[in-house]
Every structure is written in C-alpha cells, then in structure tokens.
From Swiss-Prot:
This is Small ribosomal subunit protein uS3. GO terms for cellular component: cytosolic small ribosomal subunit. The keyword Ribosomal protein applies. Residues 16-85 form the KH type-2 domain.
C-alpha cells in the first residue's frame, strides 16, 4: 500500500512538472520541489523569471493553484516562487533557450556553440549538448557538442551531473535537446583537466526517413 502511494505521488509530480513546462514557457521554468505540510502541499517553483510565474496582480499563480487543486487533486496547494540563481548553469533553462532558438529558425550548431560558451563562462566544470532529429534534411541524426570535463556513466554521472531534456517543434519534425552540466562546485578525485576551450562535435546519422 505504501509503495503504491509512493508511485502515485511520483506520477502526479511528473504530470505537474510537464504541465508547468508547458504553462510557464515565458518564465524560463526550471523545476519544482514538493513538500507536504500539516496544512497542505507546498510547491516551490524555480524559474528564471519569477514575475511571469506570479503574473499581473498574482493572476497566474492563482490560476496555477486552482489547476493543481481541481485537475491534479493536490491538497491545499501553496505555491512559492524562487528565482534560479544562475540560469546558465541550469540545464532546463539552457535547454529551453536552445529549443526556442531552433523554433525561431536559428541554426542548431550556432545555437549550441553559443549555449556552451555561456555555460562554461559561468564556471561549469563541463557541458554536453545533444541535439537529435531532422536538423537540416530528411535524415534524422544526432549532433553532440561538448566542452570541459564530463562523466557519462556510473555513480558520479548520476550524482554530479545535472540533466534536462526539452523538445523543439520544427517544420521537419520534433527535435530533442538534451543538456548535461557538471556543476562548478563538484570535486572529483580523478580530475586532471587541461581545457583548450575548443568545443568538440560528434555527428551521427540515427535513421533515414522513408518519406
């Protein structure tokens, strides 16, 4: 019974997270933090632009609160809004900006290079950006852009690397954008890095469209 309740809560949080992603696009939405209290549920929303989450005269935050209570059955939801400390070190915010740029017609390579420079300029130990889909033709492919130090597997990758996945809707189809950032404050025992400042690129053809 406890396990079923735990799974149900996780599913609910995932659905709410997806709802906020869609609803708070202009706010530079990052993530949410749930905490149950004796009088209800406190939900902390982290975003690049808190003002857009609150809305004019609190209109948006009231709408979000009502939706959580009526459509997601959250008991007495209380929304708190916090600003992301450094948007260029937040993979969700970085990924959203990349996706938005792609939707506006910016070239994926230029967009990724620009994002990597901002991330590394903010002090990140390393960054990886993976863009997958029909980027410039009928062939779907995967482009990877990396700089600095990055753990790709094992416990360090899970504990020290922040990740996010966003979607960009282009004329050719849906393009996935994955961002991985190694935070500035991490300390690794095997770290010996001499960074040249050169962004590495890897291109892979993943499938061929039959259309």
């Amino acid at each position: 019974m406890i396990e079923r309740t735990f799974v149900g809560e996780n599913v609910s949080e995932t659905l709410i997270d997806e709802y906020f992603k869609t609803k708070l696009v202009r706010a530079g939405y990052s993530h949410i933090d749930f905490k149950k209290t004796p009088i209800g549920t406190r939900i902390t929303v982290f975003a690049e632009k808190p003002g857009f989450v609150i809305g004019r005269k609190g209109k948006m935050v009231k709408e979000l609160t009502e939706t959580l209570a009526t459509e997601y059955s959250v008991k007495n939801p209380q929304i708190e809004v916090k600003q992301v400390e450094n948007p260029d070190l937040d993979p969700a915010v970085v990924g959203h900006k990349i996706a938005s740029s792609l939707e506006r017609g910016m070239h994926f390579r230029k967009t990724a290079h620009s994002a990597i420079r901002r991330v590394m300029g903010s002090g990140a130990k390393g960054v990886a950006i993976i863009v997958s889909g029909k980027l410039s033709g009928e062939r779907s492919r995967t482009e990877k852009f990396m700089d600095g130090y990055m753990k790709h597997c094992g416990e360090p990758a899970e504990a020290l690397v922040n990740k996010s996945h966003q979607l960009a809707k282009l004329k050719l189809g849906i393009v996935g954008v994955t961002v991985k950032i190694m935070r500035p404050d991490v300390s690794l025992p095997d770290e010996i890095v001499i960074s040249s400042g050169e962004i590495k690129e890897v291109s892979e053809i993943s499938e061929v469209s039959q259309e």
